[in-house]
């Protein structure tokens, strides 16, 4: 199994990683060491001899304790990798063992084939037998290309030679060293070094792990160290010759290292035997390494995606929040947005709402609920009424229906509480309004905050009345008076003028109590007498509903509105005349401070209103 794993690893790593790294590093290290081996270059001839011994030797290494002797052969070729291995004596050796063999093979081919060809053949041979390679090297050195094929044969023989491993007499072991010289030939590896560089890093990372395992080899060191060292030294010399052929300089240095390292390497032989194990471990490392990189990349992306997609969406959402943020003024509206569904129900009220503003906010609202049906028509009429407002006569008729409706408005008070929702709803209702709401909302927040609800409906109507607004312009000021009391002040005068126009209403002046009339207007019928006072109590809630104060103000504006309608129906204008002083009040009312005040004035009126209400009601 390990062999198979080694094969796979060796094949892969060999092709580029191990061979390249070992060749590159070994060559570099050899650069400093092989010189001595160069001296023993003659051994190449011995190499030819050594091949036989090498086979025997190598099998021993694999087959038996020969590990010590094996170590020598190993040293022979590992030394080249020694440069590498020293750091990782244990693990790399196996690879190096393989690599060196590859070098052994490569040395002849290395110049040309070593990089491209050797890797393939190496894949198989190295795994088969590090030592096997050595012998094969020794045998094959003459025929580089053959070296590759023979290696396999060599491998097989080594296995078969395991018994020969017994032969592996010390002399063969020495010969085995000569095969290492063949490894020394690895000098060609220098050529490899280029390709090695390709995957050196990959190979490197894995080797360390392998090294760890090799450590066990130390025991073998004990046995091998001494003989291996000696053998190594001579082998190194022999190696040098091969090295010389390809790159004596580079390889020469390695030999010295080999000598010192041989001891270190001695363990590698066992490591070699173990090498399969290491290689298994090793094999995992490479995979692990390769996967880790991708996984990191992937892992980040997913997070990035999950965050970024969500984040991105979040940003996208965040923008909406800004968009909503404008609504924030809408603060209620947002909720109401959700309610919008219900808004449908409200939707009628919203239209109704639009009318409600005119009638008169405080009581009429209550009566307004029923108006919804009538109101629904009124809204249309309302939109015209705005223009007709000036045409006070028409509005009255239109309003008259609202009046009946108003009686039922009592529920609306609750609706009023919803007004905030309605507020949001108004936007839905009037698409055009939707934009205004924001604009509106800003002003409302300051002073309008309460009015907004009630006002919001009017705005819808307003939006519709835009044309009338021109005519309305005076009332509009009245409407906006809350914020622009200055403008409002003019409206009051206008109101006063209106009263003059209403001079006929003077009889309605009798309704002076009706100043609440605006309220009574609707209330008078049902809401009227008692409700009106109670209605006032509800208005307090409206007061609580900040909107009510605006209501009062709206009333005031409404009067302006209503005045047109009221002329026929309401003596509201007369009350306004009476309120002429209040008109200033109303002006102040716009200021908010008067907000609170306005409620009380209505209250004051309320007392009178009740009796008149009763009378009025009785009259109807």
From Swiss-Prot:
Query: Where are the annotated segments for 3 X approximate tandem repeats?
Result: 499-600
**Which residue ranges are recorded for the region named Contains the Ser-Pro(4) repeats?**
205-620
Compositional bias per record (Low complexity), positions renumbered to this chain: 145-163
Q: Where is this region: Disordered?
A: 34-620
Q: Where are the H-A-P-P repeats?
A: 70-73, 148-151
State where the protein is found: Secreted, Primary cell wall
Q: Does the keyword Secreted apply?
A: yes
Which windows of the sequence hold sequence repeats? 229-235, 236-242
- Pro residues bias: start-end ranges: 34-45, 106-129, 178-219, 251-552, 562-613
- One of the GO biological process terms: cell wall organization
Q: List the disulfide bonds.
A: none
Give the UniProt entry's GO cellular component terms.
Answer: extracellular region; primary cell wall
Enumerate the transmembrane spans. none
Q: How is this chain modified after translation? A: Hydroxylated on proline residues in the S-P-P-P-P repeat. O-glycosylated on hydroxyprolines.
Keyword terms: Cell wall, Cell wall biogenesis/degradation, Glycoprotein, Hydroxylation, Repeat, Secreted, Signal
**Per its UniProt entry, which superkingdom is the organism in?**
Eukaryota
> What tissues is it present in?
Expressed in the tip of the emerging lateral roots.
Q: Where is the composition biased (Basic residues)?
A: 164-177, 229-241
- Role of this protein: Has a specialized structural function, possibly in the mechanical penetration of the cortex and epidermis of the main root.
- The molecule here is called Extensin
Please give the organism: Nicotiana tabacum
């Amino acid at each position: 199994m390990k062999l198979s794993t080694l094969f796979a690893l060796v094949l892969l790593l060999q092709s580029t990683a191990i061979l390249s790294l070992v060749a590159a590093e070994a060559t570099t290290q050899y650069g400093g060491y092989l010189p001595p081996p160069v001296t023993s270059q003659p051994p190449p001839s011995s190499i030819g001899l050594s091949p036989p011994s090498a086979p025997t030797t190598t099998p021993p290494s694999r087959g038996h304790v020969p590990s010590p002797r094996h170590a020598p052969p190993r040293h022979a070729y590992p030394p080249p990798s020694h440069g590498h291995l020293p750091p990782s004596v244990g693990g790399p050796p196996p690879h190096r063992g393989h690599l060196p063999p590859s070098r052994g093979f490569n040395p002849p081919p290395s110049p040309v084939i070593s990089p491209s060809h050797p890797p393939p053949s190496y894949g198989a041979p190295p795994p088969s037998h590090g030592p096997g390679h050595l012998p094969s090297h020794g045998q094959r050195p003459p025929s580089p290309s053959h070296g590759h094929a023979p290696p396999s044969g060599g491998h097989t023989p080594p296995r078969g030679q395991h018994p020969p491993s017994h032969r592996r007499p010390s002399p063969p072991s020495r010969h085995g060293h000569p095969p290492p010289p063949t490894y020394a030939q690895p000098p060609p590896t220098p050529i490899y070094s280029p390709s090695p560089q390709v995957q050196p890093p990959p190979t490197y990372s894995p080797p360390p792990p392998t090294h760890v395992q090799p450590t066990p080899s130390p025991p073998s060191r004990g046995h091998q160290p001494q003989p291996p060292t000696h053998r190594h030294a001579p082998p190194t010399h022999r190696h040098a010759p091969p090295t010389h052929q390809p790159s004596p300089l580079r390889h020469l240095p390695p030999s010295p290292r080999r000598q010192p390292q041989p001891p270190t390497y001695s363990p590698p032989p066992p490591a070699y035997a173990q090498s399969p194990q290491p290689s298994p471990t090793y094999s995992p490392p490479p995979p692990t390494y390769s996967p880790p990189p991708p996984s990191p990349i992937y892992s980040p992306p997913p997070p990035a995606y999950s965050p970024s997609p969500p984040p991105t969406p979040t940003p996208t959402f965040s923008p909406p929040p800004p968009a909503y943020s404008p609504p924030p003024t809408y603060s209620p509206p947002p909720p109401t947005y959700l309610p919008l569904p219900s808004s449908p129900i409200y939707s009628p009220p919203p239209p109704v709402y639009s009318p409600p503003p005119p009638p008169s906010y405080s009581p009429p609202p209550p009566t307004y609920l029923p108006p919804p049906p009538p109101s629904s028509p009124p809204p249309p009429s309302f939109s015209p009424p705005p223009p007709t407002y000036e045409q006070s006569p028409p509005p009255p008729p239109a309003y008259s229906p609202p009046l009946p409706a108003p009686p039922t408005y009592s529920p609306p008070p609750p609706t009023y509480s919803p007004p905030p929702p309605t507020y949001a709803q108004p936007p839905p209702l009037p698409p055009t309004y939707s934009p205004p709401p924001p604009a509106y909302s800003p002003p409302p927040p300051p002073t309008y905050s309460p009015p907004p609800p009630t006002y919001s409906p009017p705005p819808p109507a307003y939006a519709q009345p835009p044309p009338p607004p021109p005519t309305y312009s005076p009332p509009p000021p009245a409407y906006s008076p809350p914020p622009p009391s200055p403008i409002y002040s003019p409206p009051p005068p206008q109101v006063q003028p209106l009263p003059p126009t209403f001079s006929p209403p003077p009889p309605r002046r009798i309704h002076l109590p009706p100043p609440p009339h605006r309220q009574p207007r609707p209330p008078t019928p049902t809401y009227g007498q008692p409700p009106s006072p109670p209605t006032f109590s509800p208005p307090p809630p409206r007061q609580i509903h900040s909107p009510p104060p605006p209501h009062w103000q709206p009333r005031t504006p409404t009067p302006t509105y209503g005045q047109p309608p009221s002329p026929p129906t309401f003596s509201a204008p007369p009350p306004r005349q009476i309120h002429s002083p209040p008109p200033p009040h109303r002006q102040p009312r716009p200021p908010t401070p008067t907000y609170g005040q306005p409620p009380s004035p209505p209250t004051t009126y309320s007392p009178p209103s009740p009796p008149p209400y009763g009378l009025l009601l009785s009259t109807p």
